[in-house]
Amino acid sequence: MLRNIYYALSPQLRLFVRKLVYWPVDLFSPKNNRIPPKGLIYTGRGDFLQAGKYWTNKFIEEGGLLPDDKLLDIGSGIGRMAVGLTSYLKTGEYEGFDAVKQGVDWCQINIQSKFPNFQFKYVDLSNDLYKSSGIDASTFAFPYPTDHFNFAISVSVFTHMLPHEINNYLAETARTLKQGGILFATFFIIEKDPINAR
C-alpha cells in the first residue's frame, strides 16, 4: 500500500520524500565520496559498490569491454556503473547521460572531477518515473557524434520506457556506435504464459 502511495506522487515529490526518509541515515553515515547519500539514490538497491563491480565484470567477461574502449552509458543515473568502471577504463573514455539532474551533479562532483576521462551530461528528458516535463524520449537525439563509441551500456533503462521510446534509443545507439560496436542492455522478457515462465 505504501508503495502505491509513493508512486502516486509526482517524480519531484518522490525524490523529496526519499531525501526526507533517508536524511537521518545520511546524516550519521560515514562520508564516502564513492557512494552517494541514500537520499539521492533514486533507483536500484543493494550494495552500491558491489553492484558496480558486478556489472563491470559482466561487461568485460560477457560483452568483451576493453580498457581502452570508448563507452556510452545510456541513463548513467547516480553513477553506479561508472564507479565500478573507474578502475578498469584507465585509458578508455566514458560518457554518460541522464535525465535526473541531481544524479548528474553528484557524478560530476564525485567521479568526473577525479577521473577526467569520465564525463556526465544532464539531458532534459521527460520520464514518468523521474521527471514529468522535458524532451520526449521518442524524438531525443543523443548528444554524441556518429560512429564514436565501441561499447554502449543500458542497464535498467529500457525497463522504464515505452516501445516507441526504446526504438528511438536503439536507433540512436546504433548511430553513435562504431561498426562492430557492442550494446550491453537489460530488458524485461515477456512470455506468452507469464505465470509459468519460470
Segments predicted by a language model, with ranges:
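Class I (Rossmann-like) S-adenosyl-L-methionine-dependent methyltransferase catalytic domain
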Residues: 2-62, 78-85, 93-141, 168, ...
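Conserved class I S-adenosyl-L-methionine
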Residues: 68-77
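Short glycine-centered segments of the SAM/dcSAM-binding site in methyltransferase folds
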Residues: 70, 181-182
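A conserved beta-strand element that flanks and buttresses the S-adenosyl-L-methionine
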Residues: 153
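Short catalytic micro-motifs in class I SAM-dependent methyltransferases
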Residues: 156-157
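Helix-capping/helix-break motifs at membrane-protein junctions
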Residues: 162-163
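A short glycine-rich, Lys/Arg-flanked "PGG" loop and its adjoining helix->strand segment in the class I
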Residues: 167-179
